[in-house]
């Protein structure tokens, strides 16, 4: 049997944004193109990217509201046009922009008559309200509306259990989905075995991320998922990798003197700081300084790290301790100076 040779494109794979617009504060649109791709590749990438965009990205939302003197969720309050349930549904729609993890406190405390909007939410400086005009309630009489809020960062849709009713606290189902919709389409060109494809990717976001930022985050999350397969060939380098994997932590490698620098750099680029299990505050400081991978981190001196806003000596020491436990690279030759400060 004679097999036909299947040609492989020698052109560099490129992507670009061909359209970008903001229809409103809570609706951004972006259209991207990736080409040239071999037959079948566009669908593979398109399906994976769409699922990652809709299910893997994190968002910030209100997860709990508390107000005194409210008998139950479906009750009404004199002087307030909406029922308690309607107010909770309006709070559920609030869109925030934040990189911080953990539970944050916010509040609303106003007096009517007036129109209550997202602008009336008193939130931490680290939390930005995307659309301050979002409607919450209408106070028709001179009554007070005071609500304590819990804001959290999460992923996907999470149904909250109904508890703590006695203290006037009500859970709000978390919708932590910054991407409202994502579609992909494919354009084929060429003939026979030379047929190639162009992937078109459309992304709509809620304003907490731009479509380009969403595309970057989704790509990074997909890379994180495939990293364990890429590391399979490195098992001989570090015999302790199996133990690391059993602990569900990032696979670490011992770089000996014979390891080629190019190979070392490629591996470091594949490991993102998300996998180092850093404390939330340290992680957020690094991200704000555009330190995304282990290669980015190792290229910084301790003086560079200390110049990061809100970074402390203890944070640098903790980073070095985490890396030293997983790598045989000697990162702490001068660790005594941390203790002497």
Swiss-Prot record:
GO terms for molecular function: DNA binding; DNA-directed RNA polymerase activity; protein dimerization activity. InterPro entries: DNA-dir_RNA_pol_insert (IPR011262), DNA-dir_RNA_pol_RpoA/D/Rpb3 (IPR011263), DNA-dir_RpoA (IPR011773), RBP11-like (IPR036603), RNAP_asu_C (IPR011260), RNApol_insert_sf (IPR036643). Its main location: plastid. SUPFAM superfamilies: C-terminal domain of RNA polymerase alpha subunit, Insert subdomain of RNA polymerase alpha subunit, RBP11-like subunits of RNA polymerase. One of its GO terms (biological process) is DNA-templated transcription. Its EC number is 2.7.7.6. The keyword Plastid applies. Residues 266-341 are annotated as: Alpha C-terminal domain (alpha-CTD). Residues 1-233 are annotated as: Alpha N-terminal domain (alpha-NTD). The keyword Repressor does not apply. It catalyses: RNA(n) + a ribonucleoside 5'-triphosphate = RNA(n+1) + diphosphate. It comes from the Eukaryota. Keywords: Chloroplast, DNA-directed RNA polymerase, Nucleotidyltransferase, Plastid, Transcription, Transferase. It is found in: Plastid, Chloroplast. Pfam families: RNA_pol_A_bac (PF01000), RNA_pol_A_CTD (PF03118), RNA_pol_L (PF01193). GO terms for cellular component: chloroplast; DNA-directed RNA polymerase complex; mitochondrion. In plastids the minimal PEP RNA polymerase catalytic core is composed of four subunits: alpha, beta, beta', and beta''. When a (nuclear-encoded) sigma factor is associated with the core the holoenzyme is formed, which can initiate transcription. Belongs to the RNA polymerase alpha chain family. The N-terminal domain is essential for RNAP assembly and basal transcription, whereas the C-terminal domain is involved in interaction with transcriptional regulators and with upstream promoter elements. DNA-dependent RNA polymerase catalyzes the transcription of DNA into RNA using the four ribonucleoside triphosphates as substrates. This is DNA-directed RNA polymerase subunit alpha. It comes from Nymphaea alba. The lineage of its organism: Eukaryota, Viridiplantae, Streptophyta, Embryophyta, Tracheophyta. The gene is rpoA.
């Amino acid at each position: 049997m004679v097999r036909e040779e299947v040609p492989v494109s020698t052109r560099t794979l490129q992507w670009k944004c061909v359209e970008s617009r903001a229809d409103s504060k809570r609706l951004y649109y972006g259209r991207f193109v990736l080409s040239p791709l071999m037959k079948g590749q566009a669908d593979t990438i398109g399906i994976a990217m769409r699922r990652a965009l809709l299910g893997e990205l994190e968002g910030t939302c209100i997860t709990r509201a508390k107000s005194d003197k409210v008998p139950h969720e479906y009750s009404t309050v004199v002087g307030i046009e909406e029922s308690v349930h309607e107010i909770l549904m309006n709070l559920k729609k609030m869109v925030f922009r934040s990189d911080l993890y953990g539970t944050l406190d916010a509040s609303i405390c106003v007096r009517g008559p007036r129109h209550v909007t997202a602008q009336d939410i008193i939130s931490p400086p680290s939390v930005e309200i995307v659309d301050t005009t979002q409607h919450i309630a209408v106070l028709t009489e001179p009554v007070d509306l005071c609500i304590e809020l819990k804001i959290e960062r999460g992923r996907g849709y999470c149904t909250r259990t109904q508890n703590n009713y006695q203290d006037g606290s009500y859970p709000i189902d978390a919708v932590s989905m910054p991407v409202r919709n994502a579609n992909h389409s494919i354009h084929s060109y060429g003939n026979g075995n030379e047929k190639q494809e162009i992937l078109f990717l459309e992304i709509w976001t809620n304003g907490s991320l731009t479509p380009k930022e969403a595309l970057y985050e989704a790509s990074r999350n997909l890379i994180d998922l495939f990293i364990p397969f890429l590391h399979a060939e490195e098992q001989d380098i570090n015999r302790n990798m199996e133990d690391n994997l059993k602990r569900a932590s990032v696979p670490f490698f011992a770089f000996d003197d014979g390891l080629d620098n190019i190979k070392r750099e490629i591996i470091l680029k594949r490991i993102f700081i998300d996998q180092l299990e850093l404390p939330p505050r340290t992680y957020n400081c690094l991200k704000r300084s555009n330190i995304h991978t282990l290669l980015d981190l190792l290229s910084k001196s301790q003086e560079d790290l200390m110049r990061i806003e809100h970074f402390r000596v203890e944070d640098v020491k903790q980073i070095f301790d985490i890396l030293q436990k997983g790598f045989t690279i000697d990162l702490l030759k001068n660790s005594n100076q941390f203790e002497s400060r």
